[in-house]
Amino acid sequence: MFKSYTSNDNLLLPPCLGDFIPQNDPVRVVHRIIEQINLEKLYRRYSPQGCSAYHPRMMLQILVYAYLRNIYSSRRIEEFCRNDIRFMWLTGNVTPDHNTINRFRSSRLKDVLKTIFATIVKFLVAEGFVSLDVACTDGTKMEADANRYTFVWGKSIHTRISRIAEQLEEIWQYAESVTKQELRDSAPITYQDITPEKVEKALCQIDDALNGVDADRKMKAKVRRVRKSWPEQLRKYESQGKILDGRNSYSKTDNDATFMRMKEDHMRNGQLKPGYNPQISTNRQFILNYTIHQCAGDTSTYPLHMDNFHSLYGRYPDVSVCDAGYGSEENYLYAFRHGIETFIKYNNFHKEQKRNFRNDPFLSANFYYNEETDGMYCPMGQRMERLSDARRITDNGFVQTISRYRARNCKGCPLRCRCHRSRSERIVQVNHRLRKIKEREREKLLSDEGLKYRSQRPQDVEAVFGNLKNNKHFKRFHLRGLKKVEIEFALLAIAYNLAKVAS
């Protein structure tokens, strides 16, 4: 009735672990490809002296295969190395502990894993799995391994320093009025040059001036109190400013994480959480390039992302396909300078295709512009005079030129109520260089080739993020610090690509 079994039966010969693993198992793909790539840079991170270490090729294989199996904890990886036949086959029946696995992941792979990732992608290109000619780029936000209530805000630091400067000025003026003499400095410290040393020196001068003078006891006590606390607070704000490094916020748990509004907002309250902004470029749903950014927006990440692509492969993609989050003047010109053909949507691209937008003569985008005479004409046909040119500087230091035009006489115009509601004449702002770029880009996006790339992009790059977040359950990083986050995402990208090969 039942098949017999014996748990304690001994075999005549020791079994080979590979005999129990199917030939089409993903672990064989991981083993085969990583065995073929050059890991010389990784070997150089080891010293020939001291006790022998676990082989870095074997350690890399078990980490990549663990990420392929959605195993991200070093303790769970150690457990699988002891109990899972596939991990035992990769390690050759040796079992590195979780500390060894974590040290290898966090320290040994630093600054070399990106090169290993590029080597694997080049191998896949040579095998015909993927091409570097077309790159679909997109980004997403992922939570950092940090508590959501450990925020430090840049504006809050600015406010507190300003408050100290204002109170110091009040104390200074009081000391001058009581002592009936001018203090050595004509004025206290402004916000721009406030430092702990200058504040300490100023408070010492005030304290010396108030000694032996019939002054308010509360004011004297306050001076003695802030003489101890303010320099210490300013040193704290100074160190926090260095950590911010131009950002608006950071987390005390992970100083490199920035507070962002995540796409997964289960409470629907727009709560900010510490996280990173990974950017990837894909082709045929293989990840070609990745970068990790600390800013929430995608627009400013494009030049750095493409520079990284060039550093990995010595070339830029022939075609770059992106959504409207990357459609800025800076990015279009960057791609043009480096010979990249762009199919990048811009803001209002889809809105422009609607009949209501095209047929509305009162929208500034539909105003007629004569390039030869530099004339902008309103719906009534009146020529608008050019007022001035303004400059705008982006976060990356890119300079935009904005031209301002003003209508000559809106008073008594029969179309005024439909044209604008301001009391003065209507003013229109135009970026002429961006306007020309948009005209060229619109023509490409509406062509047959543009329609092909626009329909291909969501299936390519957005499907990868959906796979990583939902099928691989990777919605939050498990390591802290920008360098370690880059290592973890590289392992995830390598594992994802090799899983695609295995499938």
Outline where the language-model segments fall.
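Basic, short loop/linker segments at the boundary and entry of helix-turn-helix/winged-helix-like folds
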Residues: P22-V64, H432, I437
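A short secondary-structure junction motif
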Residues: Q36-K41, D84, M88, N471
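Hydrophobic alpha-helical membrane-insertion signals
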Residues: M1-R28
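Anion-binding and metal-coordination hotspots
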Residues: K3-S4, L63, N70-N83, V94-S503
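A short, ordered amphipathic alpha-helix with a cationic face
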Residues: K3-S7, C51-S52, W89
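Generic alpha-helical segment signature
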Residues: N10, Q23, H55, L113, ...
